[in-house]
Amino acid sequence: MVDEATKRTLAAIPLLKTRAGPRDKDQWVGRLKEELVSLIKYVENNKKQDNDWFRLESNKEGTRWFGKCWYVHNLLKYEFDVEFDIPVTYPGTAPEIALPELDGKTAKMYRGGKICLTDHFKPLWARNVPKFGIAHAMALGLGPWLAVEIPDLVEKGIIVHKEKTSSE
């Protein structure tokens, strides 16, 4: 079941057409352009809705992505480094998004801080190859993961807001 807000968000993210990964040289350049258009549109939409929650950039080849993501809980902003590599089998395989500083702090995470998307997101990705891209991974993967995990980690005292730790 997908709620209406998720449907609206998803509908506003451009779908991709090119089935190409990093090993596909010229086709990868085309796919990367589609990825950037989709990401830019998603970020623009988020800003319009006052829902800006991540920044991403990539290496020159578009195979390694990194940046920051954040989640606001109880009016406090929790910010994390985010990183992922584009798999060689992309877009057939979704990227494994990692939040390295949360490594080992929740059961819904694999070694290296890779967030668990196996049960919900990966089957959805598989049904939508090659239409889904990085923006979709952020919107349907990392975003919902943060919304579930960060409040839980805060309530359990596993993560503490930076201002609280510096004032103690």
Swiss-Prot record:
Pfam families in UniProt: UFC1 (PF08694)
InterPro entries: UBQ-conjugating_enzyme/RWD, Ufc1
Any Gene Ontology biological process: reticulophagy
Active site: 116
Domain of life of the source: Eukaryota
Gene3D superfamilies, alphabetized: Ubiquitin Conjugating Enzyme (3.10.110.10)
Function, in words: E2-like enzyme which forms an intermediate with UFM1 via a thioester linkage.
Coiled-coil residue spans: none
Organism: Trichoplax adhaerens (Trichoplax reptans)
Keywords: Ubl conjugation pathway
Protein name as annotated: Ubiquitin-fold modifier-conjugating enzyme 1
Classification lineage: Eukaryota, Metazoa, Placozoa, Uniplacotomia, Trichoplacea
Entry's Gene Ontology molecular function annotations: UFM1 conjugating enzyme activity; UFM1 transferase activity
Family of the protein in this entry: Belongs to the ubiquitin-conjugating enzyme family. UFC1 subfamily.
